[in-house]
A protein has these predicted regions:
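Glycine-rich phosphate/pyrophosphate-handling loop used in enzymes and phosphotransfer proteins
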Residues: 1-224
């Protein structure tokens, strides 16, 4: 008998010929419904590249327009969940309250996109942050899901930037460092991050990858 990964309730499932060889349920019906309710509405009017929700008076995505003036844009963002409600609370508990075992829940919820790429590359945290929480939040989820990845990027230590404006963050030094002997020339990269907000972090990482002559990069985020 298993417990729900989200609420801990006991899961009862009758074994029949129809479900004998299926993977066991890991969420109770109530939690499955709650998580389904915060999935991105793919029918809503969104930017085709970054999935930002667009108002009726927005003819194009201002975020992508801003980024395109400074970076070669990612080809596509893939994401299944809104960064809101249950997901926002869970990521806060996982990253900032250091609840490591929530990586199992995240690994169960997310689905790596079925798209072409040569390397899956997690977006790193600063060494100080990983040392403080004792794990890297993105890598832990990928490991829990059994996904092979390559640690091509490193991040230098820097102060948290949530209080800075977009322009102030842009003026700051790029914190990413390429740390690999892999030949990235002409390769397609899938960057993986926990949250996609303004896109600056992702595109700064992409900037370093383009300097190594990658062909293009796509992004998968746990929440947007």
């Amino acid at each position: 008998m298993n417990n729900c990964l989200s609420c801990g309730a006991k899961l009862y499932e009758n074994i029949t010929i129809y479900n004998l060889f299926k993977k066991p349920n890991r969420l109770c019906d109530r939690c499955k419904e709650n998580w389904d309710n915060i999935k991105l509405d793919i029918k809503a009017r969104r930017c085709s590249r970054c999935l930002k929700h667009l108002n009726q008076d927005e003819a194009y995505c201002l975020d992508c327009k801003f980024l395109s003036a400074h970076f070669n844009l990612m080809e596509q963002l893939y994401c299944q969940f809104q960064y809101d409600g249950l997901m926002k609370e869970m990521i806060h508990q996982y990253k900032f309250l250091k609840d490591y075992y929530l990586c199992e829940l995240l690994a169960h919820l997310i689905e790596i996109p079925q798209t072409s790429y040569d390397y899956i590359v997690p977006i790193p945290s600063s060494p100080a942050h990983d040392l403080s929480r004792t794990f890297n939040p993105v890598e832990a989820v990928l490991k829990a899901k059994g996904i092979r990845f390559d640690k091509i990027l490193k991040m230098s230590n820097r102060p948290k930037q949530f209080h800075l404006t977009k322009k102030e963050r842009l003026a700051d030094e790029n914190p990413f460092i390429i740390d690999t002997e892999l030949d990235l020339n002409g390769k397609e990269i899938l960057l993986v991050d926990d949250i996609y907000t303004t896109g600056l972090t992702i595109h700064r990482a992409g900037c370093k990858l383009y300097a190594k002559n990658i062909r293009k990069f796509k992004v998968f985020a746990f929440a947007r």
